[in-house]
UniProtKB/Swiss-Prot annotation:
SUPFAM superfamilies: GAF domain-like, Homeodomain-like, P-loop containing nucleoside triphosphate hydrolases. This is Acetoin catabolism regulatory protein. It comes from Cupriavidus necator (strain ATCC 17699 / DSM 428 / KCTC 22496 / NCIMB 10442 / H16 / Stanier 337). Gene3D superfamilies: 1.10.8.60, 3.30.450.40, Homeodomain-like, P-loop containing nucleotide triphosphate hydrolases. Residues 630-649 bind DNA.
């Protein structure tokens, strides 16, 4: 403890005892009433001891994430305000903090080279600055009083913090609740508190900007009234904001509007602005609001307050209409990567036509379909068809990564940032996808505590590795996929509703394989992909029928496995029913098992070669041309004689002599 800290402690002790008359204290203690009242709260209400110096408390990562998730929507809106404010003060040594209503720093922008000093001083992500915990400080005292203020150097209660200068302003939600604190602080500053006058003014201005941005987003479905004493600013920078429901009742306001209208209500006990009717507070009729839309000159939009008669300029925004889809445009050319996914199935073709319009759109895409229906194929095709094709395509199966590892796998981590973390740290998969496409398969299985962190990636274009205080910017396209009903997961509380709407910019539903009409094309395509160059795999009609009758619960993945198995076990490149896996090679579901006895009853229909499929008719032509010389035909078509026998039996082809009871067909 140095001399300055010892003297500060003595000053706080004197100010918080009631032994000396206030006039005497005023001569000795050059601190305003707000600071002295805060010191007294620290001692008499919170039980803090000024002689016990405590460094700033930094919350561990899991606790910090809980606080961030609770204020996540508001923090995303505030982020632009933080960045703009930091741009104004960065060269002066300040950092910008956003805290929640408990005083926990949930967002922070500062100079990277000063990280160690800022963390030690508590001007850092996760720092807890409540008045009951840290004593008199800008964040905590602004929370306690609801006022914007500067706590400069020796204004702080705890002598640990007396080198700091901190200026904070409260942020209120649209119902008047104190929701957050905006703060700019510096490790060092001039001795005079007056040097922070500009800082206080800027914090107030940006706090109002953030409040207004949050208001406009929260009440975009309501009537919004913008008011200002100057007509030039009523549209671009309104001082007062009100939201009305369809009945003309006030359902929201910014902080300045609340203070103004509480005065109009006369300060009656229990009187609140919320629920008041527009016509009670303003000398105008609800049905006349249309005269105040911003299309009229601002100087013609004057309205009077009922009680005081004060005049304000008014601009009215009607409720935002739901976006209407534009009329269908002419069909766009299908990129090759997408066209390669279908053989003409109408339902899939429709989905791909929609996808073709969105390959370079910035909106996020959600693919829904059964397991194995081709969700990753579609995501990869969208990537290859887009301008990001030169960047990475990173596929992540959220259900396959253990829950204990998914955070560090996705977001990465700094060296030794948690138990088991390596000394070198790790780039997360989100960073690996920078400049390309991130495909999140089975997104419905992502743990809920990580969903808010993914939301930040989508909203801000930046990722925060585990253990880091500074986010890393990323530029990527996010495509998600699931076989779950995300709507049901949202209803069950297992999936964040705001994340669902972020991911669901456009939705594609893939048909299951059993519903597709291009099975034959798929079979040919898959067999061709897996065959050696110059070789050809064909399918018997009976095997093809079995494929068509199968229900394909595993969809494309199951079909690929079936065909790979059949190709491996078939003879001479010809897949027949016995070559199929057991699940398909048994009797066809609707076919009766053959019974022992004569091969054909006298009443059976006569053999008709014109009813044969194309392969059978071609085989008949070879046999007839050779005079039914089976060995010659087998050599000609490149198969063994036994294979030729099987094919003839399959198509019901017999030598004319054999059908007439004559000799066997010749083999020589």
């Amino acid at each position: 403890m140095d001399l300055r800290q010892r003297e500060h402690i003595e000053t706080v002790v004197q100010a918080t005892t009631y032994l000396a008359p206030p006039a005497v204290l005023a001569d000795r203690i050059a601190h305003d009433a707000i600071i002295q009242n805060s010191w007294r709260r620290c001692v008499h209400q919170y039980g803090l001891d000024p002689s016990r110096m405590q460094e700033a408390r930094i919350l561990p990562q899991p606790r910090l994430r809980e606080h961030q998730e609770r204020i996540d929507d508001f923090a995303r809106i505030a982020r632009h305000g933080l960045q703009s404010l930091y741009g104004q003060v960065a060269g002066l040594g300040y950092v910008v903090l956003l805290t929640d209503a408990q005083g926990v720093t949930v967002d922070y922008i500062g100079e990277a080279r000063s990280d160690a000093a800022l963390r030690h001083a508590g001007l850092y992500l996760g720092a807890e600055w409540s008045e009951s915990g840290a004593g008199t400080c800008a964040v905590g005292t602004a929370l306690a009083t609801g006022q914007a203020l500067t706590v400069h150097q020796a204004d702080h209660f705890d002598a640990t913090h007396i080198p700091l200068t901190c200026t904070a302003a409260p942020l209120f939600d649209t119902h008047g609740n104190l929701h957050a604190i905006l703060d700019i602080s510096a490790l060092t500053s001039p001795q005079a508190k007056d040097s922070q006058g500009l800082a206080l003014q800027m914090v107030r201005i940006y706090a109002a900007h953030i409040e207004n941005a949050n208001f406009l987003r929260a009440h975009r479905r309501d009537w919004i009234l913008k008011l200002n004493v100057a007509p030039e600013f009523v549209d671009v920078n309104p001082e007062y904001l009100l939201a009305l429901d369809e009945a003309g009742r006030i359902v929201g306001h910014n902080h300045r509007a609340r203070l103004m209208l509480e005065g109009e209500l006369g300060g009656a006990p229990g009187a609140t602005v919320l629920g008041q009717r527009f016509e009670t507070l303003f000398d105008a009729r609800l049905e006349d609001l249309g005269h105040y839309v911003y299309s009229r000159p601002s100087e013609q939009r004057l309205v009077a307050l009922t009680r005081s008669g004060g005049l304000l300029y008014l601009s009215v925004l009607p409720p935002a209409l739901r976006w209407q889809a534009p009329p269908a445009e002419t069909q766009v050319a299908m990129p090759d990567a997408l066209a390669a996914l279908t053989g003409g199935d109408a339902a899939l073709q429709l989905q791909l036509q929609r996808a073709a319009r969105l390959v370079d759109s910035p909106i996020n895409l959600l693919i829904h379909g059964e397991t194995g229906s081709g969700k990753e194929f579609l995501a990869k095709a969208l990537h290859l068809a887009s301008a990001r094709r030169g960047g990475p395509f990173v596929a992540v199966n959220c259900a396959a990564i253990p829950e204990t590892l998914i955070e560090s796998e996705l977001f990465g981590h700094l060296p030794n940032s948690f138990s088991g973390a390596g000394p070198r740290g790790k780039r997360g998969l989100i960073q690996e996808a920078d400049g390309g496409t991130l495909f999140l398969d089975e997104i419905g299985d992502m743990p809920r505590e990580l969903q808010s962190r993914l939301l930040r990636v989508l909203a801000e274009g930046e990722v925060l590795p585990v253990g880091a205080a500074r986010p890393v910017p990323v530029r990527l396209r996010v495509i998600s996929a699931t076989h779950h009903s995300l709507e049901q997961l949202v209803a069950d509380g297992r999936f964040r509703e705001d994340l669902y709407y972020r991911l669901n910019g456009a939705r594609f539903t893939l048909p299951p394989l059993r519903a597709r009409t291009d099975l034959d094309w798929l079979v040919r395509k898959l067999l061709q992909e897996g065959s050696a160059e110059g070789s050809e795999i064909t399918l018997s009609p009976a095997a093809r029928e079995r494929l068509h009758r199968h229900r394909w619960p595993g969809n494309l993945r199951e079909l690929r496995n079936v065909l790979e198995y059949a190709r491996a076990v078939c003879a001479d490149g010809y897949i027949d029913v016995p070559d199929l896996p057991d699940s398909l090679a048994g009797p066809a579901p609707s076919a009766a098992l053959p019974q022992p006895g004569p091969a054909q009853s006298p009443a059976a229909a006569p053999f008709d070669p014109h009813q044969l499929p194309p392969e059978g008719m071609l085989l008949m032509q070879y046999l007839r041309a050779s005079g039914w010389n089976l060995s010659a035909v087998a050599r000609q078509i490149g198969v063994s004689r036994m294979t030729l026998y099987r094919r003839m039996e399959r198509y019901g082809i017999q030598s004319p002599n054999r059908r007439d009871g004559g000799p066997e067909p010749t083999d020589a």
